[in-house]
Design a protein with these regions (language model features):
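Non-catalytic beta/alpha edge segments that cap or flank active sites
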Residues: 1-172
Length: 172
């Protein structure tokens, strides 16, 4: 495989919500469908309650699964008491990727103005797996998918991308 080839990545999509179901979850569906349309394999898509320990357990299980290269969560990135995505995810990071949240908020500013500062979108690497947490709004998921994730999960994106680094993320 060369840097000009596409490589399908194994991806887990988790929606963090106490109110959504797989049938009503438009944001998780948008992410899963967009990733599959790009050629990736969505290995699991599920709804997780806004519970720190259940979310962290699901993240740990996905990280331990060798076929999962990437985990994308949607929801629970705000500032209310039930918004626990960063608290569940960030302690697992071997390396944080602060540029993801910075770029996400920068791009969101064009759509929602200064309200973007309420987003705690985050990303990092844990156990050789890429983890991304994006807000639950469908527009936020669409923007993150189209303007950040699809390019960074594609070997053909130049000058660099996350896909080309996957084999090296677990180096010690």
């Amino acid at each position: 495989m060369t840097a000009n080839d596409f490589k399908a990545l194994g991806i887990a999509v988790f929606t963090l919500s106490d109110t959504r179901t797989l049938e009503t979850d438009r944001s998780g569906a948008l992410l899963a469908e967009g990733l599959e349309a790009a050629g990736h394999r969505v290995l699991t898509r599920s709804i997780l309650p806004d519970d720190l320990w259940q979310v962290r357990a699901a993240l740990c299980a996905a990280i331990a699964e060798r076929q999962v290269d990437v985990v994308v969560t949607t929801g629970a990135t705000g500032i209310t008491g039930r918004d626990i995505a960063p608290e569940a995810m960030e302690p697992l990071f071997d390396k944080a990727l602060p540029g993801f949240g910075e770029l996400f908020r920068h791009l969101s500013y064009d759509d929602i103005g200064a309200s973007t500062i309420q987003s705690r979108a985050t990303a990092g690497v844990a156990g050789g797996t890429l983890l991304f947490a994006v807000p639950g709004s469908t527009n936020a998921c669409k923007m993150a998918l189209e303007k950040i994730l699809l390019g960074q999960l594609d070997l053909r994106t130049k000058p660099c991308n996350f896909a080309m680094l996957l084999d090296r993320l677990g180096e010690r």
